[in-house]
């Protein structure tokens, strides 16, 4: 027939054809009646109250310790289940719990003997871990696993723990007072620091405000300087533009004057050409015509040079420099005119001299006859021979004029009659 069990127990079948016995944890198994036997073992967790009364610790102080342990037979591990069946099969849960309790208590006492009261009291976790470790390695051979172990209570009959607590309490109270004093001190220090930081922050804020005001004023001053500079530059540019415009107008005016003077020069040149033609047609003597031509050409060139010099001076310089340049140009033109006259006199020596003499003779005659024009009356004294009256006066004047060439010859060394009869020489 079939037998079943829950997950909290295991079945062991032995007998005919069951060597070794079959162990089933939480399941079913077929058993032949009369020739096979079935037994059950509990897999429930057992809670053990492990008490160790008046155990002497490492310093010889007796204390009592109570621990709580959770143990059970391990059904998933076949080896541990086989070991548990060998040791506990047929026993009740109470008997199994008693065996495990005795084992745990022995290990608990051994751990207590190797530790001080302070270590057990202050470091319960360490004590629990050592008991769990030592007991687990021993109970596993029985097929029992320790699920957990916790230290529940520690007490003694000598008030050792109470005294230890008083000392600790006093220490704690002292630490509390010290901590309170330190806290007050720290609070005062922090308050002073806070006030100092507040004052420092206020000063820093004022400093930052002063810096900001300074930066604002500096930037404003820089902007004002830049604005004034731009304004001055604009005014200067306007003045420069006005000056340039005036200069351009003056240059255009000078150019117009130059053009006008050039036109005047052209007109004068045309007039000179016309007069030269008239001179050629009217003047009989070639020397006079040539001299007149050279003089007019020199005057024209002088006028042209003067106007060109004035125009160039006006376009290059302003009025003062232009006038100085024009004066120099006039001087050069006059010098050139004199040079042309000198060349003409050199080319036509006798004719030129004759021309000058003939030109000056009327002035000489005028100067000679000048006293006669201012005389109120003329008294003629005759020696008794020759003409009388007005004819006498005319004869005297003509006699003076006939002696004039001789006077000129004595003064200048030039004979008018000889110059007049000599042919003209050309270079």
From Swiss-Prot:
Phosphoserine: residues bearing it: 19, 163, 385
Main location: membrane
InterPro entries in the cross-refs: Band_7, Band_7/SPFH_dom_sf, Flotillin_fam
Domain of life of the organism encoding this protein: Eukaryota
Membrane topology category: Peripheral membrane protein
Cross-referenced Pfam families: Band_7
UniProt function note: May act as a scaffolding protein within caveolar membranes, functionally participating in formation of caveolae or caveolae-like vesicles.
PANTHER family from the UniProt entry: FLOTILLIN-1-RELATED, FLOTILLIN-RELATED
Protein known as: Flotillin-1
Organism: Homo sapiens
Lineage start: Eukaryota, Metazoa, Chordata, Craniata, Vertebrata
